[in-house]
Amino acid sequence: MPYRQRAALEVLVAHPGGPLWARKDAGHWSIVKGEVNPGEDPKDAAAREFQEETSWVAPEGRWLDLGSVRLKSGKTVLGWAVEADLDPAGLNPGLFSMVWHGRRQQFPEVDRVAWCSPEEAQRLLNPAQGEFIIRLMRALAD
């Protein structure tokens, strides 16, 4: 999860693409994430997925380990934060395909990203992932 310090802390959150998410907003955004391949280091997977889903090379710098959270679906999400200043207008998301209305179609992995205050990010994020914001603020305060 990229973060930046402007007048105040901001974090970059992503809205999932595709028709299943088109009319869902608050509580449905996410950190950029994905699957860890067998034998892959989880941090390397996070960097790979970040690039696959946004087209941006994962930011360099010190990655803060934010631990893990468990989603209602039972999936475990591992989180890291790294300081970066990315322009949402430069988003060029990867695509996935699915059958929709009887035919296979392609949709963006992420349809938009936004810089948000921690409070706004917690409102937008999947509730379990809001914990990453709290952990980031604690890590930056230390």
Predicted regions, residues:
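Residues that flank catalytic or metal-binding motifs in active/ligand-binding sites
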Residues: D25-G27, T76, E109
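Charged phosphate-binding loop/patch that engages nucleotide di/tri-phosphates or the phosphate backbone
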Residues: P118-D142
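Non-DNA-binding regulatory cores of transcription-related proteins
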Residues: Q105-D111
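Residues that scaffold the ATP/ADP-binding catalytic core of kinase and kinase-like folds
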Residues: R23, G39, L124
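Active-site-adjacent beta-strand/loop module that shapes the phosphate/pyrophosphate-binding cleft
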Residues: S68-R103, A114, L136, L140
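The catalytic Nudix box helix
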Residues: I31-L64, S117
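Short, charged/polar surface micro-motifs in flexible loops or helix N-caps
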Residues: R6-A8, G18-W21, N37, S73-G74, ...
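N-terminal strand-loop-strand
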Residues: M1-I31, W80
